């Protein structure tokens, strides 16, 4: 199971992320890995069905509201310069940067996108 995060702006001032869940494995074309690279294009049909196009494949999914949302936390450990400030504790702090309330589930196998193939005469 592969999980990918999409970010957007939420109403509470926090970023609202959407979790994408794919069945199977995604491999990069080159050995550089997937981090920071474009995976594909996410579109919605007029009926609101999410469609993910990855290379020459298309996946249809559905949006699911999570019962218990996830919070994205950033750990902040005070360094030496932070300890010099008066009134600051020396403990580790966690900052909530985003909320994940929905996920897009792609549970079917990808279908190949076939263009017009010229026939040899």
Swiss-Prot record:
It holds the Pfam family Ctf8. It is found in: Nucleus. Keywords: Cell cycle, DNA replication, DNA-binding, Nucleus. The keyword Nucleus applies. It comes from the Eukaryota. The keyword Nucleus applies. Component of the CTF18-RFC complex, which consists of CTF18, CTF8, DSCC1, RFC2, RFC3, RFC4 and RFC5. The CTF18-RFC complex does not interact with the Rad9/Rad1/Hus1 complex. The CTF18-RFC complex interacts with POLH. CTF18/CTF8/DSCC1 associate with PCNA. CTF8 exists as a dimer with DSCC1. Chromosome cohesion factor involved in sister chromatid cohesion and fidelity of chromosome transmission. Component of one of the cell nuclear antigen loader complexes, CTF18-replication factor C (CTF18-RFC), which consists of CTF18, CTF8, DSCC1, RFC2, RFC3, RFC4 and RFC5. The CTF18-RFC complex binds to single-stranded and primed DNAs and has weak ATPase activity that is stimulated the presence of primed DNA, replication protein A (RPA) and proliferating cell nuclear antigen (PCNA). The CTF18-RFC complex catalyzes the ATP-dependent loading of PCNA onto primed and gapped DNA. This is Chromosome transmission fidelity protein 8 homolog. The lineage of its organism: Eukaryota, Metazoa, Chordata, Craniata, Vertebrata.
């Amino acid at each position: 199971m592969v999980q990918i995060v999409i970010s957007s702006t939420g109403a509470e001032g926090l970023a609202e992320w959407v979790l994408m869940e794919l069945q199977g494995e995604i491999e990069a074309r080159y050995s550089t890995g997937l981090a920071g690279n474009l995976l594909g294009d996410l579109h919605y049909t007029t009926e609101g069905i999410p469609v993910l196009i990855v290379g020459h494949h298309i996946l249809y999914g559905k949006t699911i509201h999570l019962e218990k949302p996830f919070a994205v936390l950033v750990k902040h450990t005070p360094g030496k310069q932070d300890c010099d400030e008066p009134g600051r504790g020396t403990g580790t702090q966690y900052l909530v940067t985003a909320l994940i309330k929905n996920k897009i589930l792609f549970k079917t196998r990808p279908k190949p996108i076939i263009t017009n193939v010229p026939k040899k005469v």
